């Protein structure tokens, strides 16, 4: 299972760039395997992302903004959901992954 982070490499919004960076840094720091999917370069992936976000999770207006997070083809959530799971220490549950036991640094 690979976490897919749908992002926009050419976004002019600083907030979106910071949120994307925060998600990727968290995944790297926790050694969670992930794949970046750039929706600005691949129209078919943008359409796939829109189609696979559950209707009840779509914004009231407009299109869903990146980053959007999937575990393979299963939708996990957007940045706000990711942030909430980070704050409540439930990120592995949010990402639909088994929690890893804490490892002691040598």
From Swiss-Prot:
GO molecular function, one term: SH3 domain binding
Protein location: Nucleus
Keywords for the protein's UniProt record, in alphabetical order: Nucleus, SH3-binding
Family label: Belongs to the SH3BGR family.
Organism: Xenopus laevis
CDD domains from the UniProt entry: GRX_SH3BGR (cd03030)
Pfam families named among the record's database cross-references: SH3BGR (PF04908)
Motif annotated as SH3-binding, chain positions: 61-67
Cellular component, GO annotation: cytoplasm; nucleus
Main location: nucleus
Recorded superkingdom: Eukaryota
Protein name: SH3 domain-binding glutamic acid-rich-like protein 2-A
The UniProt record lists the keyword Nucleus: yes
Coiled coil feature spans: none
């Amino acid at each position: 299972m690979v976490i897919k982070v749908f992002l926009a490499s050419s976004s002019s919004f600083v907030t979106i760039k910071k949120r994307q960076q925060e998600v990727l840094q968290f995944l790297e720091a926790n050694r969670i395997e992930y794949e970046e999917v750039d929706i600005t370069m691949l129209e078919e992936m943008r359409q796939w992302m829109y189609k696979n976000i559950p209707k009840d999770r779509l914004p009231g207006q407009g299109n869903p903004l990146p980053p959007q997070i999937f575990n393979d083809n299963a939708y996990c959530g957007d940045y706000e959901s990711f942030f909430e799971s980070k704050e409540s220490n439930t990120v592995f549950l949010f990402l639909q992954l088994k929690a890893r036991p804490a490892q002691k640094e040598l």
